[in-house]
Amino acid sequence: MGQELTHETFVYYLLNKPQGVISATEDSRHKTVLDLLDETARHKQVFPVGRLDIDTHGLLLLTNNGDLAHAMLSPKKHVDKIYQAKVAGIMDEEDILAFEKGIKLKDHTCQPAKLEIVSVDRNASTSLVQITIAEGKFHQVKRMVAACGKEVADLQRLKMGPLSLPNDLELGDWRRLTQEELDALTIFGIPLA
């Protein structure tokens, strides 16, 4: 009586991407997110769903399900991404309103976004903020903060859609999605198995 083997069509990994690693499948100069996975995971030909800048850390989903990736990245879906930023400068009510209206950048006006001030250190002239955006333009969070006259010193992605960065997932570590996390992804209406 042999055990029945199941073949997985799609796999899903949650990575806590460290700084200094790029969100690509291959690169000749930098370590990539695939370099952090084991051979079994790499063999599944996964790719990152979206990108985090080389100096941004935090939640990154890797999968080989192109339909899900497309749905999660589609501008029509308005998938929220939540970042925590340490900012050089004091973010204030004026900045919150600017984010709500949509920050004007050189190449486009951002969709309205949410800026929440978590804490302010007036002595060090720094702020800790959470920023929620539905877009994913090049260096968008950093550029939005810069448009307010401040600078992002550290940027971490905490959430993407229904997925949250687990507190117990160390930088550079990864794991398969839990059944609960997979169930949460069904909101995109894409077959996951």
Give, region by region, the residue ranges found by the protein language model.
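Basic, flexible Lys/Arg- and Gly-enriched helix-loop patches that mediate nucleic-acid binding at interfaces
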Residues: 1-193
